[in-house]
Amino acid sequence: MERDGDQLSARPTLETEGLRFLHVTVGSLLATYGWYIVFSCILLYVVFQKLSTRLRALRQRHLDQAAAALEPDIVVKRQEALAAARLKMQEELNAQVEKHKEKLRQLEEEKRRQKIEMWDSMQEGKSYKGNTRKPQEEDSPGPSTSSVIPKRKSDRKPLRGGGYNPLSGEGGGTCSWRPGRRGPSSGGUG
């Protein structure tokens, strides 16, 4: 019986040593890697949640496709809706193309009209640089441009007398411009 008592007393000491060893080992692991373990658990939880929602959506899609395969009416309705959407988009695209073609046609007509006006003004001896304002003047009521006689350059008076040139020093006045001296202002190069 003493042996049984010794064995019973030896068993709790082994168990307590094992528990102490486990406690020390787990405690040191948690002390060293505790935050890493916590963050990895949180990360695993988030990843699991994301994957579970995607798996649910994937299962739902499979169920919908299986139901659609079983019901041909749904497939026909989807194809008709897709064809109607394509037709609508094609009509919108065709309308945009027509608008663009009309705009290009108007621009070409405007360019052609400006070239004709420029040619006519050159035939009359006018400058063609001021033609950008002509279409606005044509819209306003008033005398037509063909009835107005263009002035010649010889009819105009010069703004100043022909003999005055302020840079040359000629043409009157007591002061005349002279260029400054070159070289140092004072002292020699000695």
Swiss-Prot record:
Record carries keyword Membrane: yes
Composition bias type Gly residues, residue spans: 160-174
Domain of life: Eukaryota
GO BP terms, alphabetized: endoplasmic reticulum unfolded protein response; retrograde protein transport, ER to cytosol
First-listed, main subcellular location of the protein, grouped into a coarse class: endoplasmic reticulum
Region (Disordered): 115-190
Phosphoserine: residues bearing it: 140
Region span, VCP/p97-interacting motif (VIM): 78-90
Keyword Acyltransferase: no
Signal peptide bounds: none
Cellular-component GO terms for this entry: cytoplasmic microtubule; Derlin-1 retrotranslocation complex; Derlin-1-VIMP complex
Annotated keywords: Cytoplasm, Endoplasmic reticulum, Membrane, Phosphoprotein, Selenocysteine, Transmembrane, Transmembrane helix, Ubl conjugation
Membrane topology field: Single-pass membrane protein
Subcellular location: Endoplasmic reticulum membrane; Cytoplasm
Modifications after synthesis and translation: Truncated SELENOS proteins produced by failed UGA/Sec decoding are ubiquitinated by the CRL2(KLHDC2) and CRL2(KLHDC3) complexes, which recognizes the glycine (Gly) at the C-terminus of truncated SELENOS proteins. Truncated SELENOS proteins produced by failed UGA/Sec decoding are also ubiquitinated by the CRL5(KLHDC1) complex.
Membrane-spanning segments: 28-48
Family statement drawn from the similarity comment of this UniProt entry: Belongs to the selenoprotein S family.
Function: Involved in the degradation process of misfolded endoplasmic reticulum (ER) luminal proteins. Participates in the transfer of misfolded proteins from the ER to the cytosol, where they are destroyed by the proteasome in a ubiquitin-dependent manner. Probably acts by serving as a linker between DERL1, which mediates the retrotranslocation of misfolded proteins into the cytosol, and the ATPase complex VCP, which mediates the translocation and ubiquitination.
Quaternary structure note: Interacts with DERL1 and (via VIM motif) with VCP, suggesting that it forms a membrane complex with DERL1 that serves as a receptor for VCP. Also interacts with DERL2, DERL3 and SELENOK. The SELENOK-SELENOS complex interacts with VCP.
PANTHER family: SELENOPROTEIN S (PTHR28621:SF1)
Protein name, as recorded: Selenoprotein S
